[in-house]
Swiss-Prot record:
Name of the protein described by the UniProt record: Ribosome-binding factor A
Keyword Cytoplasm: yes
Organism per entry: Rickettsia canadensis (strain McKiel)
Cellular compartments per GO CC: cytosol
Sorted UniProt keywords: Cytoplasm, Ribosome biogenesis
GO terms of molecular function: ribosomal small subunit binding
UniProt cross-references to InterPro entries, sorted A to Z: KH_dom-like_a/b, RbfA, RbfA_dom_sf, Ribosome-bd_factorA_CS
Family classification: Belongs to the RbfA family.
Quaternary data: Monomer. Binds 30S ribosomal subunits, but not 50S ribosomal subunits or 70S ribosomes.
GO terms for biological process, alphabetical: maturation of SSU-rRNA
Function: One of several proteins that assist in the late maturation steps of the functional core of the 30S ribosomal subunit. Associates with free 30S ribosomal subunits (but not with 30S subunits that are part of 70S ribosomes or polysomes). Required for efficient processing of 16S rRNA. May interact with the 5'-terminal helix region of 16S rRNA.
Claim: NADP is one of the keywords in the record: no
Length: 129
């Protein structure tokens, strides 16, 4: 495994930023995508590139859609090669990273934490009465 240096970390961040921009552009235009994604607004929440620059883990969050997370994952994975080719054309590197999509559980986790905190607060209020 490649050692993480300051220069390499900068390259990771730069590549992640470029991939994020390209994904947003592709999703906005709807080019080269599985037909199920046309009426499925997605937010790319983050892109994390591995130290060796070979894998880009892309996290998404769907908005107001009838599709399940599994359907969205399947549609994104069907579009993966076209997306990778588009990324390759936008970056100036010998190799384009493999793109992997993941559902971003951060929003769901934040809602759960908020509910837990609210329950604790209510229990404290009830105890104080």
């Amino acid at each position: 495994m490649k050692k993480l240096t300051k220069t390499n970390a900068h390259r990771q961040q730069k590549l992640a930023s470029i991939i994020n921009e390209v994904l947003i552009e592709i999703l906005r235009r709807g080019k080269m995508l599985d037909i199920r994604l046309f009426n499925c607004p997605l937010a790319i929440t983050k892109v994390i590139v591995t130290a060796d620059l070979k894998i880009a883990n892309c996290y998404f969050l769907p908005f107001n859609t009838k599709l399940t997370i599994d359907d969205i994952m399947d549609a994104l994975n069907n579009s993966k090669n076209a997306i990778r080719n588009f990324v390759t054309n936008k970056i100036n590197m010998k190799f384009s990273p493999e793109i992997r999509f993941h559902y971003d559980h951060g929003f769901d986790n934040a809602i759960k934490v908020e509910k837990l905190l609210k329950n604790i607060s209510l229990k404290r209020r009830d105890k104080d009465k």
